[in-house]
């Protein structure tokens, strides 16, 4: 009986305790209800402010938009979006300090670090501070090495600054992000410009120093670009100008033996450390394989001029003019005829050149010939 009485008493006490705890819980819940209601109301207000702020920004009411968006950033469920839009509104009012502050707030959210950084870079570019934008983008590119938007924007800034070494160094990452073909034009432009910059680099008073720098750079050029005719022509041309004619000639001959391209023979015009007679032998060998090729004929004519072989030069230019109506050949021919004292032929060559131009000019009224 005692044991049973104890069990009954314990059960009663437990039931009473449950009732009391339930009552206390309900009381606490009811006491917190106004707090939750207040929070819900604040979030609803913040959402309306975010929506209204965005619409005001679209309508060009930047000051009103900024005020609404800042309030939404402080109380709403979407603080990241609110701070980013507030930064845009402040930037449009040229309030740099405020826009930077809002972007810092956005950066505090891990998800907003990259987009806030991109906006900082864009604002810096808009304000005329490309170096500041570049520094910001470099940090972002290290944080997110595969982010396409960051990499492309960074590349555009480097290209606008003509920092070809940095852009060429960035190209492997760009190609991994976008694929081999997407950035091929930018890569080609960058390496062509870097070759030119190196060949004309200030501080090198001697051609030997610049030529050596150029050769070192050529080793770093990607293999597929070393097979690009325009790239080969640019590099070989600079080598020739800097006294590396033998290397330039070997490079041109090697490439042409694999694949012919009319952009390569003119490199021989810049070679001064090989005799014109030897160069003419090479050119005449190419002409035997490709008779009437205007690029080779014009180059041969100019090399013949260097050798003071006037008759031979005239023959090459005439052949080029007759085979292709080359404007360059006609101009060279007119100049040579004039120098030889044959004004009549010089005038005829000039008129043939002019007739070519007339086909490219718009049809417009002209004065009648005077009687």
Predicted regions and their residues:
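Transmembrane alpha-helices and immediately adjacent membrane-cytoplasm interface residues
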Residues: 5-39
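Alpha-helical segment of the N-proximal tetratricopeptide repeat
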Residues: 40-78, 85, 123, 199-209, ...
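Structural motif corresponding to the intra-repeat A-B loop/turn of tetratricopeptide repeats
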Residues: 59, 93, 127, 161, ...
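TPR-repeat structural position
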Residues: 62-63, 96, 130, 164, ...
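Alpha-solenoid helical repeat scaffolds
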Residues: 81-85, 101, 114-119, 135, ...
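Alpha-helical adaptor scaffolds
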Residues: 87-92, 100-108, 113-125, 195-196, ...
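TPR/TPR-like (Sel1-like) alpha-helical repeat modules
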Residues: 108-109, 142-143, 155-180, 249-262, ...
């Amino acid at each position: 009986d005692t044991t049973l009485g104890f069990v009954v008493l314990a059960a009663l006490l437990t039931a009473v305790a449950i009732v009391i705890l339930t009552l206390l819980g309900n009381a606490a819940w009811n006491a917190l209800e106004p707090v939750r209601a207040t929070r819900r109301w604040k979030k609803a207000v913040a959402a309306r402010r975010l929506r209204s702020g965005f619409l005001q920004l679209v309508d060009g009411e930047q000051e009103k938009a900024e005020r609404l968006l800042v309030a939404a950033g402080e109380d709403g469920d979407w603080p990241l979006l609110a701070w980013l839009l507030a930064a845009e509104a402040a930037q449009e009012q040229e309030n740099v300090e405020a826009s930077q502050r809002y972007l810092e707030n956005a950066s505090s959210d891990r998800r907003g670090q990259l987009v806030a950084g991109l906006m900082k870079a864009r604002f810096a570019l808009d304000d005329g501070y490309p170096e500041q934008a570049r520094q910001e983008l470099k940090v972002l590119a290290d944080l997110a090495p595969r982010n396409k938007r960051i990499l492309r924007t960074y590349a555009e800034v480097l290209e606008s600054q003509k920092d070809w070494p940095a852009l060429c160094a960035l190209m492997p990452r760009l190609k991994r992000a976008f694929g081999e073909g997407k950035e091929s034009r930018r890569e080609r432009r960058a390496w062509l410009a870097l070759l030119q910059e190196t060949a004309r680099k200030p501080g090198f008073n001697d051609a030997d120093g610049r030529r050596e720098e150029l050769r070192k750079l050529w080793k770093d050029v990607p293999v597929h670009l070393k097979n690009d005719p325009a790239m080969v022509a640019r590099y070989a041309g600079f080598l020739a100008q800097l006294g590396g004619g033998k290397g330039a000639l070997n490079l041109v001959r090697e490439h042409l033996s694999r694949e012919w391209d009319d952009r390569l023979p003119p490199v021989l015009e810049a070679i001064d450390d090989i005799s014109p007679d030897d160069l003419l032998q090479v050119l005449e060998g190419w002409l035997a394989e490709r008779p009437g090729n205007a690029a080779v004929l014009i180059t041969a004519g100019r090399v013949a001029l260097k050798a003071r072989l006037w008759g031979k030069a005239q023959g090459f230019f005439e052949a080029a003019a007759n085979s292709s109506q080359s404007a360059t050949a006609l101009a060279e021919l007119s100049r040579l005829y004039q120098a030889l004292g044959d004004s009549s032929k010089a005038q005829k060559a000039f008129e043939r050149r002019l007739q070519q131009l007339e086909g490219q000019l718009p049809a417009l009224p002209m004065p009648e010939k005077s009687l």
